[in-house]
Amino acid sequence: MKFTATFLMIAIFVLMVEPGECGWGSFFKKAAHVGKHVGKAALTHYLGDKQELNKRAVDEDPNVIVFE
């Protein structure tokens, strides 16, 4: 019960504070900046692997059937 009450009080406090007060604005700007870099790195990593798979798919011609 104490945890629930504490959680609710902190949530109410966080929701009532405006982004310009107490440096919250700079915190959110920095978090967004970091998020953009992390997202770009993850996307680059994912697409890098995907391009290698596409290259292999082009190298192997699916129209050619070889029986050994």
UniProtKB/Swiss-Prot annotation:
Primary location recorded for the protein, binned into one broad class: secreted
Propeptide: 48-68
Function as written in the Swiss-Prot or TrEMBL entry: Antimicrobial peptide with potent activity against Gram-positive and Gram-negative bacteria. Activity against E.coli and B.subtilis. Weaker activity against L.mucor, s.marcescens and P.aeruginosa. May play a role in innate host defense.
Tissue specificity note: Goblet cells.
Signal sequence interval, chain numbering: 1-22
Name of the gene: ple2
Keywords: Antibiotic, Antimicrobial, Secreted, Signal
One of the protein's GO biological processes: defense response to bacterium
Protein's recorded name: Pleurocidin
Source species, domain of life: Eukaryota
Taxonomic source organism: Pseudopleuronectes americanus (Winter flounder)
Pfam families, per database record: Antimicrobial12
Similarity comment: family membership: Belongs to the pleurocidin family.
One GO cellular component term: extracellular region
Localisation per UniProt entry: Secreted
